[in-house]
């Protein structure tokens, strides 16, 4: 396809595709910069690229949000041009033989929670949290996680009044069945709690290599979703998190205890994992499992192995010098990936060499970066042409509650609901001022004695700029 987009972006080879379009490599003919170009036929039955581009514009400036460079129509296609990114976490998970160490998962968890929290502060849910939708950056941003694919995103509150969307049931399953929350399976309208529960499943997937409801056989897609739902509901949190630190049990109990319109305490969840990270003696040096596999000398230099703790004289934790040792070894090596076959292509294009002088930037959770995507056959994503409607026999049990939310502002809706239990019992908290699980309700059920303190949300400084998008046509 010989096409120049917007007068300056030349279309290259196809690098990915999904249920909502195709992804191409592109290049800015004026600067030589490589970009990602997402195409969607204007005649598609359920167009969403224009909607997705609006969400990208709303989220611009956030850490781990790709820059949108151009959107418009070229011939028969709606086109969005954004930053080119590296491999997805699914690609890297496969590269690491489908299991990640606790250290790598905890380093990722901190960034992933930040990405989800940022979307929520902008008034939107993602609704398709999965490893394929988190990509690593390129070059100096190679250690930064980016969140992509906002086509299923939904506004959950009015940007001016902060009024929360109403509680509803009998909703179709939106997202990817493997990582969908229990209440999403049961047809309950999604809210912030559901993105966080999905993120918890992603973390357990990384740690354990698979989830209990993977590989279930069924005759139709609906029957498969039914089986996944039944298995997910019947698996106690303690069984799901067996042989993993208790912080993951606490994470799930917290997420499932949130009411529909509750504002999650993101700081509490991040603190759970940060305290565990420090207690394990790890260094936040951005030496991920895939870094060690690609550059074994980094692992030995940093005093870590891919499956053990860091033993170092430096004080463990998040304040340690991030990638100084990695800089010395990598020198000016530009970490460059392509999708699909991201890591393999990277290995072919960049043989391990350590002769260059140090010039690697310290990549913390800073600003922007690039883009790319791969769709995996086992993702079980429910697209708009085949939605799953929860059967009435497993409908969520709803009950109105007038208990004021301790986290939401006065303008947030007080309508809430009881969730359907999907856990076999409580866990235990992990100390350090964090609430124990005994203070929490049984997983999935609401409690009038719920007493978590909520962090007061900072006033959105960009509200005025965002109001121009208030007329944005949003998903039902």
Swiss-Prot record:
Recorded catalytic activity of this chain's protein: L-seryl-[protein] + ATP = O-phospho-L-seryl-[protein] + ADP + H(+); L-threonyl-[protein] + ATP = O-phospho-L-threonyl-[protein] + ADP + H(+)
Primary localization: cytoplasm
GO cellular component terms, A-Z: cytoplasm; stigma papilla
Record Gene3D superfamilies: Transferase(Phosphotransferase) domain 1 (1.10.510.10)
Residue numbers annotated as active site: 128 (proton acceptor)
Subcellular localization(s) per the UniProt record: Cytoplasm
InterPro entries (alphabetical): CK1_Ser-Thr_kinase, Kinase-like_dom_sf, Prot_kinase_dom, Protein_kinase_ATP_BS, Ser/Thr_kinase_AS
Compositionally biased residues, Low complexity: 382-422
Composition bias, Basic and acidic residues: 357-367
Biased composition regions of type Gly residues, renumbered to the chain: 423-432
Keywords assigned by UniProt, alphabetized: ATP-binding, Cytoplasm, Kinase, Nucleotide-binding, Serine/threonine-protein kinase, Transferase
Superkingdom to which the source organism belongs: Eukaryota
EC number assigned by the record: 2.7.11.1
Binding site for ATP: 15-23, 38
PTM annotation, UniProt: Autophosphorylated.
A GO MF term: protein serine/threonine kinase activity
Subunit description: Monomer.
Function, in words: Casein kinases are operationally defined by their preferential utilization of acidic proteins such as caseins as substrates. It can phosphorylate a large number of proteins.
Family: Belongs to the protein kinase superfamily. CK1 Ser/Thr protein kinase family. Casein kinase I subfamily.
Name recorded for this polypeptide: Casein kinase 1-like protein 7
Source organism per UniProt: Arabidopsis thaliana
């Amino acid at each position: 396809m010989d096409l120049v987009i917007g007068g300056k972006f030349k279309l290259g080879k196809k690098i990915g595709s999904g249920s909502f379009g195709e992804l191409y490599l592109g290049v800015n003919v004026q600067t030589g910069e490589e970009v990602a170009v997402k195409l969607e036929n204007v005649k598609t039955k359920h167009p969403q690229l224009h909607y997705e581009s609006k969400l990208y514009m709303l989220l611009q400036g956030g850490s781990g949000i790709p820059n949108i460079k151009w959107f418009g129509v070229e011939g028969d296609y709606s086109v969005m041009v954004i930053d080119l990114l590296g491999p997805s976490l699914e690609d890297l998970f496969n590269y690491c033989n489908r299991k990640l160490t606790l250290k790598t998962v905890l380093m990722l968890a901190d960034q992933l929670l930040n990405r989800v929290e940022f979307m929520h502060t902008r008034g939107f849910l993602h609704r398709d949290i999965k490893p394929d939708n988190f990509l690593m950056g390129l070059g100096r941003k190679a250690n930064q996680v980016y969140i992509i694919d906002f086509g299923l995103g939904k506004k959950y509150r009015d940007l001016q009044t902060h009024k929360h969307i109403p509680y509803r049931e009998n909703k179709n399953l939106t997202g990817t069945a493997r990582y969908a929350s229990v209440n999403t399976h049961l047809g309950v309208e999604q809210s912030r709690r559901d993105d966080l529960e999905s993120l918890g499943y992603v973390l357990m997937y990384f740690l354990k290599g698979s989830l209990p409801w993977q590989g279930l056989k069924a005759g139709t897609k609906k029957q498969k979703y039914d089986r996944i739902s039944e298995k997910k509901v019947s698996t106690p949190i303690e069984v799901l998190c067996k042989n993993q630190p208790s912080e993951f049990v606490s994470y799930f109990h917290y997420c499932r205890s949130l009411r529909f319109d509750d504002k999650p305490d993101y700081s509490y969840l991040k603190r759970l994992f940060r305290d565990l990270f420090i207690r394990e003696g790890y260094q936040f040096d951005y030496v991920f499992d895939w870094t060690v596999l690609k550059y074994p000398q980094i692992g030995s230099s940093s005093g870590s192995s891919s499956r053990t703790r860091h033993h170092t004289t430096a004080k463990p934790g998040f304040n340690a010098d991030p990638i100084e040792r990695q800089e010395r070894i990598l020198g000016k090596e530009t970490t460059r990936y392509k999708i699909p076959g991201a890591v393999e292509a990277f290995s072919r294009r960049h043989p391990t060499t350590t002769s260059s002088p140090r010039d690697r930037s310290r990549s913390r959770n800073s600003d922007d970066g690039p883009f790319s995507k791969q769709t995996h056959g086992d993702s079980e994503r429910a697209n708009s042409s085949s939605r799953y409607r929860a059967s009435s026999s497993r409908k969520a049990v709803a009950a109105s509650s007038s208990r004021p939310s301790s986290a939401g502002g006065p303008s947030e809706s007080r309508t809430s609901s009881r969730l359907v239990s999907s856990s076999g019992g409580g866990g235990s908290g992990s100390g350090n001022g964090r609430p124990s699980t005994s203070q929490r309700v049984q997983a999935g059920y609401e409690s009038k004695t719920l007493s978590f303190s909520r962090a007061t949300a900072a006033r959105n400084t960009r509200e005025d700029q965002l109001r121009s998008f208030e007329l944005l046509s949003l998903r039902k």
